[in-house]
Amino acid sequence: GNNIKTVDYLGFSDAYGEGWWNEFSKIAEARKIQLVGSERFNRTDTSVTGQVLKILAAKPDAVLIGGAGTPAALPQKALKEKGFKGQIYQTHGVANNDFLRVCGKDCEGTFLPSGPMLVAAQLPNDNPVKKSANDYVNKYEAANGKGSVSAFGGYAWDAGLLLANAVPAALKKAQPGTKEFRKALGSSGK
């Protein structure tokens, strides 16, 4: 989609970055997207100019930044400062206010995945997760202050909801501590 036929990758030089590269390269191949490069950077780097110049020379339609947190702002800002006009994609690891603060206007137009709690108020009323997402946001912000919600707490909330539904169903099938209970729990009690 979006007329993206070539992508370059710029990710952390650690297991996180490598994991994203490994998965993304498989998906790109399956989708007939040409990978024109694969660059790495360290979380503590203060410059990625060399990597960005290689990316610009390859002229990709898009760049996927395989990073998380505020360190992922560095390549985004460098790409924009050097004139990259293509689409930039980030991972779910940047779905937080600290990243937005550090990246500033250079983040505008970036695509990234996120759970619904970060956009709960913007979801249509008939969205099946709007009520649960708003419930989480309201409870979290009541305890921690307005604007404090993050995607990461939402993932734990989701896990809690799954357990709240799976445990009663598993208890109907087996006793806690047994192999049967673990099996029932792992299949949401079905």
Question: What residues fall within each predicted segment?
Answer:
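Extracytosolic ligand-binding ectodomains
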Residues: 1-190
